[in-house]
Regions:
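Bacterial Sec-dependent N-terminal signal peptides
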Residues: 2-10, 15-35, 99-117, 296
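C-terminal, surface-exposed recognition/capping segments
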Residues: 21, 113-115, 123, 127-156, ...
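Solvent-exposed, low-complexity, repeat-rich "mucin-like" stalks and linkers
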Residues: 29-59
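Extracellular/surface recognition and adhesion modules
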Residues: 48-50, 63, 94, 107, ...
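Short strand-coil-strand connectors
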Residues: 53, 66, 97-101, 123-125
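Low-complexity "stalk/linker" and mucin-like segments enriched in Ser/Thr/Pro/Ala/Gly
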Residues: 56, 64-79
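Extracellular/luminal low-complexity segments enriched in Ser/Thr/Pro
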Residues: 77-89
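A short beta-strand micro-motif common to beta-rich folds, especially ectodomain repeats
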Residues: 87-100
Length: 296
């Protein structure tokens, strides 16, 4: 009987020793703990670490996002963006939970507007304008060339030729045509669009100079407006000039306004003729020029 009691006591002591030696989860952390991302960029890969080393093997990890409509996370911890653009930055908190421990990664998700500076032309023209053309990495680059209503660039920056996306027969009936009179259909960041008819008329009014007799003060006032808009020479492509742009002394960008016969209004500034600004109402469908976005 005493042997039985001894053996039972020994077994209990051994079991207690095993339980005492079983490792416990001490710390849990997510890498990176914070990150910033623009909506067309790749989200970071998350790495979950814990102490003691190896403690997570075989354990259940529960992943959650507090804004899954913006950034979702899978059961195995892979992030995915659910939006293509945002008007305002959003903070998304990703949480990993294991037993009684949690770890978080705070993501700041920014829209495409984060790549631009905003020039306030309200006092002069009645609206704000971005500091560069769509697709330009800096304010001194030309950016992308677009046919009106075609959201795929047909050339970029200093390209000498158009690419395979160019369509000499492009029109409103073409597959993929987007009505750029609606801001949400344009290549602009969310909340921005192409200049409307009223905005184009404001540009025309504030930058008009007579061919003869303009005063020094009038010339200086127009130059100040154009300088503030930070315009860069662009040139253009069309079906007659798909290999080699028209002169780079011209600054061109599209408006939201449709003209006659499938044409569209465009801004044009010729640096070679003393700084004359033109609102051209005959931008043809085969024409490819940059996009500059505005907002009231």
């Amino acid at each position: 009987m005493r042997h039985s009691i001894f053996y039972a006591s020994a077994a209990l002591l051994a079991l207690a020793a095993c339980k005492k030696d079983e490792p416990k989860l001490e710390t849990l952390a997510l890498e990176p703990a914070t990150a910033e991302v623009i909506t067309d960029e790749v989200l970071p890969e998350l790495k979950l670490t814990a102490t003691p080393e190896g403690i997570l093997e075989g354990k259940t990890i529960t992943w959650t996002s507090d804004k899954p409509e913006i950034v979702a996370i899978s059961e195995d911890g892979a992030l995915s963006l659910k939006v293509t653009d945002l008007e305002e930055p959003q903070t998304v908190v990703i949480t990993a939970a294991v037993e009684d421990k949690t770890a978080t990664c705070t993501l700041t998700v920014k829209g495409l507007i984060a790549r631009y500076e905003i020039i306030d032309m309200t006092s002069a023209l009645g609206f704000k304008i971005l500091d560069r053309n769509v697709g330009a990495k800096t304010a001194d680059e030309v950016g992308n060339f677009y046919q009106w209503g075609k959201n795929t660039p047909v050339a970029a920056n200093n390209d000498a030729d158009v690419n395979s996306n160019y369509d000499a027969e492009w029109s409103a009936s073409s597959t993929g045509f987007a009505d750029w009179s609606k801001p949400e259909n344009t290549p602009c960041p969310k909340g921005w669009g192409l200049p409307t008819e009223d905005q184009m008329k404001a540009i025309d009014d504030k930058t008009y100079l007579p061919y003869w007799g303009a005063t020094d003060e009038e010339i200086a006032a127009v130059k100040a407006i154009l300088d503030k808009m930070h315009l860069v020479n662009t040139g253009s492509f069309d079906k007659r000039n798909t290999t080699g742009k028209t002169p780079d002394t011209y600054v061109n960008f599209w408006s939201a306004v449709s003209g006659d016969n499938g044409n569209h209004w465009m801004f044009q500034y010729n640096n070679s003729d003393g700084g004359m600004v033109y609102i051209v109402k005959t931008g043809t469908p085969d024409l490819a020029i940059p996009v500059r976005c505005v907002k009231e």
